[in-house]
């Protein structure tokens, strides 16, 4: 896998902080004079959301409110090309559309039908993102991911599980 430190450009910064700390988020935006935010902070394990929904509400709902508050304050101070090119990219999930039967499909126009605390928290964050776009004009883009893969991913997730089974010649 690739690390940020492997990138030739040094204008990409990874900041490890608490998404619920609005002042810290705003400080990071203004300190680095950003022109895009790629929001990847989330609690994302469906089973854990059932046994411990509070952390999902905190990170995925209160955290997005904190991020939106900081982003709006930052965006309000931008002028010219910086304002014209600024974007907040919000990573969501296909889980917001609910469970599908084997032959069903959905599009981004499908109604939300969350079926777990995780998907409900992500649907809530999607609604907040859209509200900030429509109410305040904050430029946003939501991406609904499914079965993403990366280092340190939990082994029961689809892609690591499939790879593991293939390596063991299992179905």
Indicate residue ranges for each PLM-predicted region.
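C-terminal substrate-binding subdomain of Rossmann-fold SDR/epimerase-dehydratase oxidoreductases
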Residues: 13, 17-20, 160, 166-171
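Glycine/proline-rich active-site loop of Rossmann-fold NAD(P)-dependent oxidoreductases
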Residues: 123, 148-161, 168-171
């Amino acid at each position: 896998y690739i690390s940020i430190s492997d990138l030739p450009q040094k204008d990409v910064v990874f900041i490890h902080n608490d998404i619920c700390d609005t002042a810290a988020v705003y400080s990071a935006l203004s300190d680095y004079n950003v022109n895009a935010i790629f929001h990847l902070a989330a609690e994302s394990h469906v089973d854990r959301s059932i046994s411990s929904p509070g952390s999902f509400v905190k990170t995925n709902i209160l955290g997005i409110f904190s991020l939106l508050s900081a982003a709006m304050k930052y965006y309000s101070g931008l002028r010219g090309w910086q304002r014209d090119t600024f974007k907040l990219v919000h990573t969501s999930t296909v889980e917001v559309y609910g469970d599908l039967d084997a032959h069903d499909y959905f599009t981004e126009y499908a109604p939300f039908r969350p079926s777990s605390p995780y998907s409900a928290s992500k649907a809530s964050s999607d609604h907040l993102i859209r509200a900030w776009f429509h109410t305040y004009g904050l430029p946003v883009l939501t991406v609904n991911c499914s079965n993403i893969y990366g280092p340190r991913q939990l082994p029961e997730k689809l892609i690591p599980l499939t790879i593991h089974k293939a390596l063991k010649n299992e179905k």
